[in-house]
Amino acid sequence: MKGMCLMDVNMLLKQLTVEERAALVAGTDFWYTNPVPRLGIPALSVSDGPHGLRKQLGEADNGIATSEPATAFPTAAATASGWNPENLRHIGEAIARECRHYGVHVLLGPGVNIKRNPLCGRNFEYFSEDPYLSSEMAIAEIEGVQSQGVGVSVKHYALNNSENFRFMGNSVASEKTMRAIYLKVFERIVKQARPATLMCAYNRINGVYCAENKWLLTDVLRKEWGFDGLVMTDWGAVKNRVTGLQAGLDLEMPGDTAICRKQIIDGIADGTLAMEELDKAVRNVLNLIDRTYQETDSTPVDFDAHHALAAEIAADCAVLMKNDGALPLKPSDRLHICGEMFEHMRYQGAGSSMINPARLTTPKDAFEARGTANGRSRRTCAPSNGRTSSRRIRRCPPPIQASCWA
């Protein structure tokens, strides 16, 4: 994987001021790194998300505002059920084409945290409770994305397996447990896929924040596994910028806070932070720019083809848990369908993984298309009560009130 920037990193390092160095190791806002115009160093664009591009429109919003149209591929939880890494390779290639079209250089994904607890609110973004399956799927997706010149950010490094107290939680585990399960997925990815970046997590590990954990970021990641990419923070994970740099953290996201920049400049001035420690991070930022920067691809995206790919993979990943003779359907069958999700389906989560789908096919659309093709007639009636989020399970409306197919 090689970008189009072709910078002389060693020459640039000699010309950068301390202030410019401090700026380069932090984002200028939620989605861009800081450029240095006088030296021709461009800004990189980063964007969510793990199973489809979420190129946000407008101001920072914590994953709520409108985003550019993109393809909503099946989530990691779904694709892992297909046990087919090639599906992920095709997804990665397609997402990367959309990234290039929208001028995105680094995709913030895939998410590979191990599913320790089924109640974790972001489990749908992750592949599996098994480090081998998770890494095999992720490796294929990463290779697909990076084959198109777009970088990835594998997240969340590490032991980030719960959303409770997400900014300060403490994951307590023995080194044996970490290496056998929670770090193994990252180790296989780093060694086999050479991801452009890793995103360190909010949580602490045995009392030490990931963004300040030298054992995690340097001893294991770089010295043992040979990682040569960049480490960025999850958004707002920095507690102490100088300690983070000394531990092996390169890029602070999302913003270029005056406090953190001052910590770096003051640290260099008073000797708390060595210039060599800062330059390691600066070099990694410059290498990432050199590796992933390319001009926006004006070629139109074939969203119809990507939507068809998503549908094909979704079908391949579907798992039939039980069948009491209802399937396969026969042309003569009369179908009784009830529930709000027949027309307003839930196909993704919220936040940083929420995609504005360029194409959307609901179950209703699919049944209408199939019904027309098979000559079936349709009768419509009142929708269900819509309380799909209620804790109470309500009875399905009688047939006369539901959508029916004959």
Q: What do these predicted regions represent?
A:
Residues 1-406:
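Glycoside hydrolase catalytic-domain context in secreted enzymes
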